[in-house]
Amino acid sequence: MTNFSSLLTTIFLCIISSATGSGTIELLISSPQTVLVEPTVCANFECAAPDDLSLARKVQRRVPLRFGTGQYHGEARERIDLHLKIIEPTSNEILALQHHRPAADTEWNSDAPIVIETSRGFNVTVQLRNLCSSNYHGKRCNRYCIANAKLHWECSTHGVRRCSAGWSGEDCSNPICAGGCSNRGRCVAPNQCSCADGFNGTRCEQCLPRAGCVNGDCVNETPNTCKCRDGFIGDRCDIDIKICSLEKPCANGGICSIDSSSSTGYKCHCPFEFVGSQCKTPLSKVRCSAEHVCKNGGACISMDDTNIQCKCRRGFSGKFCEIGNHGDCSAMRCSAGETCQISGDFAICVENDELLLTTNKPAETTKSVEKWREPRKTANDEQASDELQLRLIAAICVLFSVCVIGLALVSFFFYMHSFSKWKHPSSQQAGGSTILPTTTSIPMSTTSSGTGSPVYKVCIIDSEHRGNAPGSSSDSEPDHHCPPPHRHSPPPAYSSLVLYKKVPMAADDESSFRV
């Protein structure tokens, strides 16, 4: 869309530039005599003759007069219509009246000026040029072009739009980087590259080594790597291999050696009387008062006011027990009266009288060797004992879990059995007696029959069938009904079954008794 708009703008400007011009005609008139000059200039149309609007200007003797006409705007013509009238200022005599049509040009016509011969025999010289208005270009000032620094274009002297220096493309949007960016970045502005990570420079030609690489370069032009230059070593290439010979950092007879693992790049091997990173501290000042004089758990012993000695643990040696010896007696330095022996994984120095390494006491030698091996055997026994204890604890936990589960199952079955007996009690009691359902009452009432004999009526109310209609419990006597239950206060519930026995009665009343 942007390219299409730019194309339309260009076409519109071309149409305007071919038909319209804008500017001012500048004149430069010189005369050997003082005269009045009345010019009439028509840049975009033809003039018939000098008119009343023409203004006479005074040209001093041998003093050129430079002035401009009014600004014109309209059709751009190839030639300018110029009328000149020369007047003598005192008598107003017309000395010359001429008409010229010079070609329009933005440069002065100094090579071919207009020469006007007066009637008094002297000549008046006239030069002119076409001075274009702002944004108009070309000899006829008919090319309209606006420079735009934001869009990176400018206008030539002829009004042709062109890209500014450092830009290219149809829309002047492509920056130019002289020499490119070495395929390690992209050009974002004239001669300005945006480099990829790990590269730098005007053209991204510099490979950046790893951060902290002091005296090194990239390995095979690969960023974030470090290859030391000649004469330097170390992970950061900050150790000069000539440091021992040039600086001589070890004092008091210490021997300097290159050590790339050290922060200083070297290591001092001090004589016995001095200590420190540069062998500058006398041993007499340290003695056993300082912490960790003896390394690796060695014991410090003060020999006198100026000397100390480190008694090292098994497997370590050296002046300060700083050397670990793992099964190698060649690196051990045992003192007089001691012998290096391999005990387990360590090489140790043992006094000769303690080991009793003599041919006439082989039994004691064997006992001494067994004594050194005893700690390893004890350690194995302790490990086996710990494993046995763990297994025993695990077995106890399993047995306890089984017991708890069994007890829970027994309790569950006992509870279910008891609940079943309570839910379904037996219907017969001992002695053949019948246990009736729970009842609420045994109301009895008497009525008189027609003969005067009493009639007994017994109502047995089953607690489980109390909801039935009254009187429905007796099929044999439908005309007699039990009194309705008291609806305000129900009878109390019985807590036990009631055994109803036979009701005593007279022999003659047996026929009238109904249940």
Swiss-Prot record:
- Predominant cellular place of this UniProt entry's protein: membrane
Keywords per UniProt = Cell membrane, Cytoplasm, Developmental protein, Differentiation, Disulfide bond, EGF-like domain, Glycoprotein, Membrane, Notch signaling pathway, Nucleus, Repeat, Signal, Transmembrane, Transmembrane helix
Q: What happens when the gene is disrupted?
A: RNAi-mediated knockdown in the L1 larval stage causes an endomitotic oocyte phenotype; effect not seen if knockdown is targeted to germline, rather than somatic cells. RNAi-mediated knockdown alters ovulation. Spermatheca calcium flux is altered by RNAi-mediated knockdown. RNAi-mediated knockdown, on a lag-2 mutant background, induces the presence of 1-2 extra mesodermal lineage (M lineage)-derived coelomocytes. RNAi-mediated knockdown on a lin-15 mutant background, causes adjacent vulval precursor cells (VPCs) to adopt altered cell fate.
Comp. bias (Low complexity): 431-452
Transmembrane segments in this chain: where?
393-413
Disulfide-linked positions: 132-141, 145-155, 163-172, 177-187, 181-193, 195-204, 213-218, 228-237, 244-256, 250-268, 270-279, 288-300, 294-310, 312-321
Query: Which range is the signal sequence, renumbered to this chain?
Result: 1-26
Instruction: Please report the name of this protein according to its UniProt entry.
Output: Anterior pharynx in excess protein 1
